Every structure is written in C-alpha cells, then in structure tokens.
Amino acid sequence: MMSLWIRIFNWFAKITGWLPFLLAFRTKVRYVDKSIQNSRIKGPAIIMSNHIQLFDYVVYLFVFWRRTIRTQAAEVLYRRPMLGPLLKQLGAIYVNRETRDFSFCDESVKLLREGWVLTIFPEARLPRDGEVRPLPFKTSSAYIALKSGVPVIPVVTNGSYFNLKKRAQVLIGTPVMAADLVEEGKTEKENLRIVSEKFRGIIRDMAEDLARRTGDESFLVREEKKPDEEEKTN
C-alpha cells in the first residue's frame, strides 16, 4: 500500500510541478551516446550523480519523468519542517550520517531488487567552495551497486538552477555494471574502494565532457597539478 502511495505522490508532484520546473530550472538534457536518447529506463536501476545543489534530485524527477525515482536523503534534510515530510512521501531512504548505521544500504538493495529506480549521490554532501569536485565517493554506493546487480546510469548536472542567464545542463551516460569494474585478486574491501574510484572517474570525465559541450566550466573545481605533472603536459 505504501509503494502505491509513493508512486501516486511522485506523479502528483510531477504533474503539479511541471510548469514551475520548466520556468525555474530550464533544463537541457544531453547524452554521451545519442543512440540511447529516446530509450527509457527498463527495470531497476541506479542513477548515480555528482551533487552540486539541494535541488539535484528534484531535477531528476522530471528528467526521468517516466519512472518513479526514489533517493537517499541525509538526516539534516529530514529535520527541516517542510522538506522532511515531503521526502518521506516521495519514498526517500533515510541516511543518518551521524551514526555508523548502514541499514540504508540494505534498504536500498531491497528497493532495487523490487524493481525501483534509485538516485544516489555518492559524495554524500554538497561541496564547499574551493573543494575539488567530485568529492571522494563513499564506498556504500559501490556496495549497493554490486549487491543489487542492477545497471548504474551515470549522470552529471552543472547545478545551474533558478538562473535566467544560464540554463541547467544534464548529461546522461551509458549504463555501467558495477561487476565489470571489479578487479580480480582483490579483497571485497579493496574492490569497494576500487569500484567507487572508478565510478568517480566516470563522473569526473563526464563533467569535463559537459563543460566542453557547453563552454561553461563554472561548476568544475579541478585538482591542482603537481609541478612534475605540469612539466609532462608542457
């Protein structure tokens, strides 16, 4: 019964929020591979994205409008008077970063095995000014992807919302299976770190790709090259 209500509320939010979304976000969607442009997500999947603004999840509700999109939300969001109840109605998974409670991982795997689409922001928080983006990925994202065995759709946003001069830009990549990123001979713990880093690399490369396509690098904060690395590139 709760699953049905989540689907109904999700669609209610999309229908009532469609016009405000068009006016406030003005999102242009691009694809790494244009052959998948008109395809829809079939079956369970993880939408794995960089995290620039609080509204990233809202944008994906409309970008992937054909499916009911669920997400993970930190405890700080649930404490907000209006936002907390809204996230609950949308079926968000509660993540308490203040404790070592990883039950959200198993809950995420359970939802994916039931056929849902889940948005994950592996950085686990918004970046601060000057921090290299994307932030290091939490290994919990790799665990969920490996344990569930569902395809991961990498997505990048420039986070340009509520901006009349510059449109929001979203780049959708080709699906990736986490199992294909595992390295033989490594322990499970090592592979969680390896897979997380590989996913981060995919998102980082896509962010660079989006910047090239749009001519806008304002959402990028790159790692400074060491002197010896600069000599090699010169």
Regions found by a protein language model. Give the residues of each.
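A generic structural signal for well-ordered alpha-helical segments
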Residues: 20-22, 64, 87, 111, ...
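Catalytic core of membrane glycerolipid acyltransferases/transacylases, capturing the structured
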Residues: 39-99
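A conditional alpha-helix N-cap/helix-loop micro-motif detector
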Residues: 98-101, 134
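Non-catalytic C-terminal accessory region of glycerolipid acyltransferases
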Residues: 4-8, 105-234
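Membrane-anchoring hydrophobic helices of lipid-metabolizing enzymes
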Residues: 1-46, 55-59, 89-92, 170, ...
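Short, glycine/polar-rich helix-capping loops at beta-to-alpha or helix-loop-helix junctions
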Residues: 13, 78-83, 163-165
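Structural motif corresponding to alpha-helix initiation and N-cap regions
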Residues: 29-32, 80, 102-105
